[in-house]
Amino acid sequence: MTQFKEETMLVHPVLIPGSGTRSWTVLGDDDVPVVPVGRFLAYLTDIGRSPNTVKAYAHDMKDLWQFLGFRGLDWREARLEDIGEFVAWLQLPPAGRSGVVTVLTSSVPEVSAATVNRKLAAVSSFYAHQARNDEGPGDLLAAWRTGGRGGWKPFLHHVSRGKPYRGRAITLKAPKKLPRILTVAETQAVLDACTRLRDRFFFALMHETGCRAGEVLGLRHEDIAAAEQEITVMPRENANGARAKSGARTVPVAPELIRLYADYLHEEYGGIDSDYVFVNIWAEPKGQAWSYQAAYDLVLRLRARTGLDFDPHWLRHSAATRWLRDGVSIEVASKLLGHSSVTTTSAVYGHLTVEDARAALEKAGWLTGREVTW
């Protein structure tokens, strides 16, 4: 097997022949693509995985190929024990990965357990894909299990609870990170810091609907039904690269949001000829669909104005948390968020803060009155 040096391996964008769809590949020595990795990444693109997912998997496969190269291993000969060594290798600082420099073991790994698990998911998916094509050592990381997976259980779950499901043989225990949310006051501060209606509408839309930034950037005027007070998120190819991660869904909105949209069209959008809701108005090229970079630049300006080091995705987390706290069922919240499964919604948002616990106890009368005194 060719032993790739770290500096010679690159993740590089490519266009899929025929469709012209943008994807990613990994280049080895002399800018030669790593064929099995390229085929795997092209497959992910063909089945509709998001560009960000494909790019992340490309970096994960680059890490795997570097590790195999340093060990002198061919990917087809790798064993489960080798993947275990790969996990340990990932947690070394870059200077220690080549084996040329010996580094002291640190109590703080180079990458988090969550990041390692994501890379293992990519490796597992790669070997499963190769196994389906009768190549490689088989489904290397697969571990078939029975019993419950934990979390939310659907109606009639008991009917299939003994059915085996595919798990992963290696998974690091990672601390669960609660989603970051904005308080009502913080959300208001972000909105009030917007000096333009377009910018205010952008964040108000995320706050109201729980949509992802990419879904909002991809909105067309035809997706907003003003009379019905509904917004439809549609998966489609967009000129700005924005993408809806899930299938089509329709989200009801408040009349105030529709009025803000109308004000934006009347006072700022004017005669611009574009299908896109969010476009360049003051920057060139005027009328071009707003890009991720333009939205991120706005976030940086708002961080400076408000002193809040926030991320747009926090507005989505805030919407979901608000719905569940206000009694919206988890099934409805899951549909509004565009999750493929209620289990996903439960895993991400099925948490209680101290404030939630206090409110529940007060509602039950535990903190407002006592049957006994002490």
Task: Specify the residue positions occupied by each region the protein language model found.
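Active-site/catalytic core of tyrosine-dependent DNA strand-transfer enzymes
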Residues: 254-307
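Short basic/aromatic active-site micro-motif
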Residues: 308-327
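Short, polar N-cap/turn motifs at the start of nucleic acid-interacting alpha helices
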Residues: 224-226, 308-309, 328-348
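Short, charged phosphate-coordinating catalytic segments
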Residues: 133-137, 206-229, 331
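N-terminal core-binding DNA-recognition domain of tyrosine recombinases/integrases
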Residues: 37-52, 62-157, 189
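C-terminal secondary-structure termini that scaffold catalytic or DNA-interacting sites
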Residues: 1-11, 364-374
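Basic, Lys/Arg- and aromatic-enriched nucleic-acid-binding interface segment
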Residues: 174-213, 217, 272
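Conserved tyrosine-mediated DNA breakage-rejoining catalytic core shared by Y-recombinases
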Residues: 214, 218-259
